[in-house]
Amino acid sequence: MKKIILALTTFLLAISLTACSSAKPEDTIDSFFNSAKKFDFEGMNKVMENNDEKYKDILKELDTKDPNAQYVLDYLKQNASKITYTIKDSEVKGDKATIKVECKFIDSTPLLQEIVAEAFTKMIGMSFSGQDLTDEKTTEMLVSIMKEKQKSVKETYVTKNVEFECSKKDNKWIISSVNDAVADVLLSNLVTAGQEFSNS
């Protein structure tokens, strides 16, 4: 499960996209989000520049036979499908453009807080009873808690701004860079939530 989250995060933080036939930079943004909302990395790869190897690594991680990892992956896919976005500003200067996008998406932080709190209590009990906590047992326990907590934790949304830097090459607009907020948008705020837990 950790490998999947890490692979997805690495992929999203290294995005460098190119549109196949975009007349406007906004079209490139639409192409990106249309594939991203489907968690369609093959579709995203078609508009990427020099990311073939990263894409292959992603597919390898996503091709999992572990039911627990698949459950988490399905959760992220379902959340991604609910992303909404609005292009708030488009500033074009010659062959350069800055596109500011407001994204609304599911915030997994409340669910993660509940999972961590219960897991911590259970792991202390297991430790005192002498039970061996393998990675497999830990993952199984976390997903079991996740399934239970999803029944009671209310689905909440958060809004973040993503800024895309675009450039025009050969009459096509490409995304040359994007800020790190895009990873939170596509991974239900897991990146920020994970950092907060690590620092607490």
Predicted regions and their residues:
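Short beta-strand edge/turn micro-motifs at domain boundaries
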Residues: 119-137, 152-198
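Residue-level signal for tight coil/turn positions that link beta-strands
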Residues: 92-96, 170
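Positively charged n-region of N-terminal signal peptides that target proteins for export
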Residues: 1-4, 8-11
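C-terminal motif of bacterial Sec signal peptides marking the signal peptidase cleavage site
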Residues: 16-19
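Core segments of small alpha/beta cavity-forming domains
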Residues: 21-67, 71-87
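Short, cysteine-centered beta-strand-loop-beta hairpins and adjacent loop/turn segments enriched
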Residues: 104-122
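Intrinsically disordered, low-complexity acidic Ser/Thr-rich regulatory segments
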Residues: 73-77, 138-157
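A short hydrophobic beta-strand element
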Residues: 95-105
